């Protein structure tokens, strides 16, 4: 008979940003153990609060099913000697299985007859298995840094206080992480019963809500926070900024969510909203509220972990906490504006970018020069791009950014606007960091794009130039920087070549770089990011590899090739031509002679080779302007016309003829054929 199963681990406060991943991994690991043990069930559901991780398995089988295990022995031909007596090999196998040779069964196959032992294995009761399963599941959690507590050597992400393991109403005895299983559950720290007993797994999680004032269902808590926050924001005429990462963190901080609305003085709205939002979201875990025009309102929403009889006191307490932080932001904003941003430029000499690469002032000088170079290439205003590059890092020296680090860039924009800088220059100070993450917006102007690319390329070339390419960790966010440059170039269709960009960036470091292969290393690294990007976009690895094999260093051109090859692959001729290209590549690789520059028409003998040569020559001439214009999809569609003449050639022509001149001419034809495709990609790498 199947029963519901429960395991709850009571702990001290778990890290909120890791709570969901811990709970999901616990469930996944435990379910994998059940599957490996052939234990039937109707699903595993995880629960998680700041002070507990729990799993409930619906209708878990009470024991493993009995099964018959077949153990094959030696072949009958090797199991008996000429007189029919068991050989030592047969006797040893039988002894190892606790039987005699005579007791063995026979297994007949089309390859012969074998000795066989069928052993009936009784399934173990689930009570004997689940404690070990849970221990293994917990040991496999993604814990970045474990801790010890008390005098024990036991390690876990946080000290463990209670353990409850129930199968139906049966308490399963056992110990995990130094704590023995018991029926005791802990309630909310400030509400409900602090401790109480649970009689059956069926009571979970309802008993926690009823007696402990704890909502163990993580997703249910999150749903309440979202719904109540939306209602609360609407009540003050706005819409809450319910960023998922913050909602997840808040959900992980409370066991009994109570959504409340508070306010702050309107005078603080004179401060750039980004600084206020940084304080509310980053420091206090509050949800800002915006009006229909996306203008910040003097209200915020917060989630309390307690149901107070006097919610006004809770609201006033939170208002009292946030007020000094907003006042700090106001003070920093007013103080910083007393000095023009450009006056802070010399102070960048005091800030180190990287020991071997110099100060942030050095980096600023390089960004300024590189931004001007890029601006010229893409038709942006060079002078404004250089001005933006010069001011790009000056806000790092302001009090606001020093205190609220995530406001860098956006505060530079506000201060530059206050100083009377050009609007696009000011905007570039904010947009220089875009895209900041996968799927983020790109810089909106060419000037911003020039500065953003200059900043990222300077970091890439500099760090690679001193031999610190990312391996496991990526402290300088080089992967993000590389993808950012690629996205800007591709999505804005800039005709830029990584070779030129990297060479220019490298030249600005003077003799600071020690890696002689820095240019190749950076370009290869950036092209490697294409693989991850296009895989995320749904392109298969072989399509990406086919283009990478040609190492095109213009990102916008790379993009055209990938899309063209993807389109080509859907054509009827694709599989045949990919196989033919692979065959041609193999043939040419084995030839160590010298090929001619052109096909000698006089040496063509077979009708099939004449037809192919004619088609290749026609396409080579016709596709020259198509290749030059980068119309790769059109080019591959035309090259698909080669399918029939190529198939006919291989069916009717002996490539490796005895006559050397004839052989060389045929190889020259195949080489010219292959080069037509290689002008786009190596389609021989396409898989079926």
From Swiss-Prot:
Cellular localization per UniProt: Cytoplasm
Assigned GO CC terms: cytosol
Entry superkingdom: Bacteria
SUPFAM superfamilies, per the entry: HD-domain/PDEase-like
GO MF: arginine-tRNA ligase activity; ATP binding; glycine-tRNA ligase activity
Alphabetical GO biological process terms: arginyl-tRNA aminoacylation; glycyl-tRNA aminoacylation
EC number: 6.1.1.14
The keyword Iron-sulfur belongs to this UniProt entry's keyword annotation: no
Principal subcellular localization: cytoplasm
Record's catalysed reaction(s): tRNA(Gly) + glycine + ATP = glycyl-tRNA(Gly) + AMP + diphosphate
Record carries keyword Metal-binding: no
Transmembrane intervals: none
Keyword line: Aminoacyl-tRNA synthetase, ATP-binding, Cytoplasm, Ligase, Nucleotide-binding, Protein biosynthesis
PANTHER family: GLYCINE--TRNA LIGASE, CHLOROPLASTIC_MITOCHONDRIAL 2, GLYCYL-TRNA SYNTHETASE
Family: Belongs to the class-II aminoacyl-tRNA synthetase family.
Subunit structure: Tetramer of two alpha and two beta subunits.
Protein known as: Glycine--tRNA ligase beta subunit
